C-alpha cells in the first residue's frame, strides 16, 4: 500500500528521491512514476532489494515510469552512504520503530535531505501497536522487529529537534495485521 501522497509533495522533474527502508519498493516505484525523477531505494535486506529491483525493472518493461532513473543501495539508516544535502525528498516509511538508535537515524536522514525540502515519515499508530505488543511477546521480541512505540507528539518533537518543521499529518491506516 502506497501511503505517500506524491501529489501533495510537489515533486518536480529533476528531483532526487530517497526511499529509506524501501522493502519491496512500493514508494520507490511510486516515485519512479513521477516525471523525470531519480528514485533511490535503500534497505539493509538484500532479499527486499532484489524484489524492489524486479519491480522497478517491470516498470521499465511496461514503460510505467516518468522517464527518470532508479537505483538501489544496501544502506543502514544510521550511516547513510550519501553526501550531505543530496535529496529533494526523503521517505522513511515504517522504519524508525525498528531502529534502536532512532535519533541517530533522524540525524542521518536530515543530513542527506536538502534544506527546506520535504521529509515524509510514517510509523505505526500508537494504540494498534500497543495492542499488538500486548497480544504477544514475540511481536516486539523478533530480531529486526519493532523496538519502540511512538506517540505522535514524541515523534514530532524528535524530528523538530533536528530542524524538521511539521506541515501536515496524514493517517493512511489505523489498523494493521500483527506479524510474528
Identify the residue ranges that each predicted region occupies:
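Conserved SAM-binding loop of SAM-dependent methyltransferases across substrates and taxa
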Residues: 24-35
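A short helix->loop->beta-strand "cap" motif at the edges of active sites that frequently abuts
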Residues: 36-37, 117
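Conserved SAM-binding motif I beta-strand of class I
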Residues: 38-43
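A short acidic, Gly/Pro-enriched loop at the edge of an enzyme's catalytic core
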Residues: 78-89
